[in-house]
Curated annotation (Swiss-Prot):
Record's keyword annotation contains Protein biosynthesis: no
Family classification: Belongs to the PanB family.
Complex and partners: Homodecamer; pentamer of dimers.
Pathway(s) this gene product operates in, as recorded in its UniProt entry: Cofactor biosynthesis; (R)-pantothenate biosynthesis; (R)-pantoate from 3-methyl-2-oxobutanoate: step 1/2
Organism: Burkholderia ambifaria (strain ATCC BAA-244 / DSM 16087 / CCUG 44356 / LMG 19182 / AMMD)
PANTHER family the UniProt entry points to: 3-METHYL-2-OXOBUTANOATE HYDROXYMETHYLTRANSFERASE
Biological process according to GO: pantothenate biosynthetic process
Protein name: 3-methyl-2-oxobutanoate hydroxymethyltransferase 2
Length: 284
């Protein structure tokens, strides 16, 4: 690539225009190094509040703060030159009122440089989504299994498995579209429901434990590469065992240090050359 070639970041408008064309690739990232690994492959990078569980060892996403999301979102934007970056609004930063959501979302976009925010919720979030989008804040909706509402839902359970639940998920997704959301994540739902929603909505659906018929798919990158093994959701396909590779490297490093194999001459400065000490006049 020429040094003068300009790399263009994918926009919210570009993501929305992919409806029915190809399949969107989405992954998570919480740091600049991970963002650099995935930005030229992923269409969308989601800086998820799953950072609390994956990086901080939290039992759920409820303890994640807005300041945490801003810090991680800014790092990802610095590392990702091409993908559209979407940052989660964490629990308790948007549910109180549309005005609260606006203040939180405005901070996220202003302080991270991200292109959009993502928020979880059903039909009760319709006014909030509309309030944000009418004020220039792009919103990715999130329906179905919503980790922030796991306590109320009785745990991390698949949604849309009965007629009432299916209707609630369907209505929430349709309401989000009408309110101006540019796309919607459908998580942990009955496959037939996700397929039906994808055929009904005019905005892209991004599935995670949903359906191959969705307009795109997303996984937590650490789940997908095998770098997070506290537990593995049913919908995750592991493409590598990064933890095994890292453990082997760590063990090899420890072995080399204990046996004085590392550092080698190539890792040292002036190895084997005599050193003259200016004050003492001695050579070491």
């Amino acid at each position: 690539m020429s040094a003068h070639t300009r790399i263009t970041r994918k926009t919210v408008t570009a993501i929305r225009s992919t409806k029915g064309i190809g399949s969107l690739v989405s992954l998570t990232a919480y740091s600049a190094p991970m963002a650099k690994l995935v930005h030229d492959v992923a269409d969308v990078i989601i800086v998820g509040d799953s950072v609390g569980m994956v990086l901080y060892g939290m039992p759920d996403t409820l303890r994640v703060t807005l300041d945490m999301m801003i810090a991680h979102g800014a790092a990802v934007v610095r590392g990702a030159a091409q993908a559209c970056v979407v940052v989660d609004l964490p629990f308790s930063t948007f549910q109180e009122s549309p005005a609260q959501a606006y203040r939180s979302a405005a901070r996220l976009l202003a302080e991270t440089g991200a292109q959009a925010v993502k928020l979880e919720g059903g039909c009760e979030m319709t006014d909030t989504i509309r309030f944000l989008t009418e004020r220039g804040i792009p919103v990715m909706a999130h329906v179905g299994l919503m980790p922030q509402q796991a306590n109320a839902a009785g745990g991390f359970r698949a949604q849309g498995m009965d007629p009432l639940s299916a209707a609630q998920v369907f209505d929430a997704a349709c309401a989000a579209e009408r309110a101006g959301a540019f796309s919607v994540v459908i998580e942990g739902t009955a496959e037939a429901l996700a397929r039906h929603l994808t055929g009904t909505l005019t905005i892209p659906t991004i599935g995670i434990g949903a359906s191959p018929a969705c307009d795109g798919q997303v996984l937590v990158t650490e789940d997908m590469i095998g770098a997070f093994d506290a537990y593995t959701p049913r919908f995750v396909k592991r493409y590598a065992d990064a933890n095994a590779v890292m453990r082997d490297a760590i063990r090899q490093y420890a072995h080399d240090v204990r046996h004085r194999v590392f550092p080698e001459p190539a890792h040292c400065f002036g190895y084997g050359k005599p050193l003259q000490l200016a004050d003492a006049g001695a050579t070491v």
